[in-house]
A protein has these predicted regions:
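Eukaryote-biased recognition of intrinsically disordered, low-complexity regulatory segments
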Residues: 1-11
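Fe-S ferredoxin-like electron-transfer domains
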Residues: 48-194, 200, 207-222, 226
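Iron-sulfur-associated redox domains of electron-transfer enzymes in respiratory
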Residues: 4-5, 15-85, 93, 209-574
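Short strand-loop junctions, especially beta-strand C-caps/beta-turns
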Residues: 9-11, 182-184, 234
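Charged, low-complexity surface patches
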Residues: 14, 138, 148, 191, ...
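A short alpha-helix capping/helix-coil boundary motif
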Residues: 1-3, 134-136, 176-178, 233-237
């Protein structure tokens, strides 16, 4: 790699040729404020907050798009630079609501942080026209507030370039410019998968997850209700970030203790139902493979992905596994098997799930998700929402003693916890399918062939003497490319895992912000560490799963299992 030499604020540094001044400065530990820039996205130089002085340039330049050159001298902290940045920021704030104290992004807002960093103490340009307030609260997952939009374009870029959905675009001119959907429809009537990546990258409160914490508090405070909660695999490796703990720390025990302090009657683990999903999905795959079923079979546990295929490729829906997601399987079992064992009227159970994903809110609201006669899951909150509840309750998270999940839905295996990262569902399925086919325990546990962070990975796996070609895909853009290959007949796989979000659930739309590739990698490493240190590492070895089948379901794909744990998907016309 060719390197160039430059000087930033008197510091001699080297940077790769073609990189930006901003990237060079950050690599040297020099802070330059940004709003439109995001490390996961292509830079556009829209906000102008990152302006610097650069030798050879007649005016201040946007460092996020200005390339380094040999011998360049850059100044990031002159009075001219500081005044220009402050002016840009004050102009943005003039057209921005002043409700920071009650905004959902209070404390996580990048605009708020930069205003403090730049020393903005009063606004010199008050009294101008402000953008009309329009709030889109139409769907179960996301809320958009146009008045808080600063036109950074991050949502447009992540939806177009990372997810390939292109739900958002700029519309209008001048002061009337806004981020809009097609024909200015609300998200409920747009081709939105509800993945929440736009909320992850939005620097303000213009796009946020729909806050359902009031529903949870109401249920907890109702003495007539039994409130049970499940926590997804990736929540335990990300929740700490909401509470001042560095990224990549596993906080399972403290999380369980915090949930008890909040008042939940039972604290269960979605890892239990992830193991259950593997039992059902794995046997479904074998049934298709051995009996000439529709192949490739594609996983269906990522609701953002399911929404996308229903919206864009409904003709390929027969490829989807009929197995419900772990969240929905858990809900069905909680209101039947658990209620029966505990002697509780299912009507009194409020089933809450803590998920890394905004699309899970929409999934729980689907008409199909009530096979037991009750909603499988009543309320879904994200990792961010749980963090807010813990802070609201005044819980000192770091001081909590670790606690264990409750039985009988609280035991999970290492195979279940790796659901939280791309390739994890595939690897978990292979661990079980291989031993089912072989009829005996096998020495191989880790399938490194399907690990990695490339957006599309493929491998040929020897499953007890049978060669199975598999693929692993993450991001909706990559998923669309895979579906085009299936349509063209060039995807000669038997089994495909798809996750909607970058990195899988570790990068979900409801996870703590800020997030970038390095943070996702730390969460991913924590997930695999959970697997390596698990006493049980194969789904079919979970004793609570064995008891569930032995005493209640009978066997995988039984009539009762099909009734409660499987579903079918349909085209969405919006």
């Amino acid at each position: 790699m060719q390197m160039v030499n430059l000087t930033i604020d008197g510091k001699q540094i080297q940077a790769p040729a073609g990189s930006s001044v901003l990237e060079a400065a950050r690599s040297a530990g020099i802070y330059i404020p940004t709003l439109c820039y995001h490390p996961d996205l292509r830079p556009e130089g829209a906000c102008r907050l990152c302006m610097v002085e650069a030798s050879g340039a007649r005016t201040l330049v946007a460092s996020c798009v200005y390339p380094v050159s040999e011998g360049m001298v850059v100044k990031t902290n002159t009075s001219k630079v500081r005044e220009a940045r402050k002016t840009v920021l004050e102009l943005l704030l003039t057209n921005h609501p002043k409700d920071c104290l009650c905004c959902q992004k209070n404390g996580d807002c990048e605009l708020q942080k930069i205003a403090a960093d730049l020393g903005v103490r009063k606004l010199r340009f008050e009294g101008g026209e402000t953008r009309a307030r329009t709030i889109d609260n139409s769907n179960p997952s996301l809320v958009r507030d146009q008045e808080k939009c600063i036109l950074c374009g991050r949502c447009i870029r992540v939806c177009r370039d990372v997810q390939g959905m292109s739900v958002y675009s700029f519309a209008g001119r001048g002061f009337n410019t806004m981020v809009s959907t097609a024909f200015e429809h609300d998200l409920l009537n747009s081709a939105c998968a509800y993945c929440g990546q736009c909320a992850d990258v939005c620097p303000t409160g213009a796009i946020v997850e729909k806050d359902d914490t009031d529903k949870v508090w109401e249920a907890i405070n109702n003495p007539e209700k039994i409130v049970v909660v499940q926590t997804a695999p990736s929540v335990r490796v990300a929740l700490g970030e909401e509470l001042g703990i560095p990224a990549g720390q596993v906080v399972t025990g403290k999380m369980v203790a915090a949930l008890r302090h909040l008042g939940f009657d039972k604290v269960f683990d979605t890892n239990f139902s992830a193991d259950l999903t593997i039992m059902e999905e794995g046997h479904e795959f074998l049934q298709r493979l051995q009996n000439g079923g529709v192949l490739p079979m594609i996983t269906s546990c990522s609701p953002g992905w399911v929404n996308m295929i229903e919206l864009k490729y409904p003709e390929l829906l027969p490829h989807l596994s009929t197995a419900k997601s772990p969240q929905q399987m858990f809900g069905a079992v909680a209101k039947t098997y658990f209620a029966e064992r505990a002697g509780i009227d299912p009507a009194k159970i409020v089933s809450v799930s803590v998920m890394p994903c905004t699309a899970k809110k929409a999934e729980a609201a689907r008409e199909e998700m009530c096979a037991s006669g009750y909603r499988d899951v009543d309320v879904v909150i994200t990792t961010r929402e749980l963090g807010r509840m813990i802070r609201e309750a005044g819980i000192d998270f770091n001081a909590l003693e670790e606690a264990e999940f409750d039985s009988p839905l609280g035991t999970g295996t290492g195979a279940a916890v790796i659901f939280g990262t791309t390739g994890g569902v595939m690897e978990a399925a292979l661990r079980t399918v291989a031993e089912v086919v072989a009829g005996k325990e096998l020495p191989k546990l880790e399938y490194n062939e399907v690990r990695g962070m490339e957006q599309t990975r493929e491998a040929v796996i020897d499953v007890a003497g049978v060669s199975v070609k598999v693929a692993v895909v993450h991001t909706l853009k990559s998923a669309k490319m895979m579906l085009e290959r299936i349509k063209a007949g060039t995807a000669d796989y038997q089994f495909i895992e798809v996750m909607a979000c970058p990195g899988g659930c570790i990068g979900g739309g409801g996870q703590p912000v800020p997030v970038d590739a390095s943070i996702r990698q730390k969460r991913r490493e924590a997930i695999f560490n959970c697997d390596r240190t698990s006493e049980l590492r194969k789904s079919h070895e979970n004793p609570e799963i064995k008891t569930l089948y032995d005493t209640w379901l009978g066997k995988p794909l039984s009539e009762k299992a099909h009734s409660l744990l499987h579903t079918h998907y349909h085209a969405q016309n919006r």
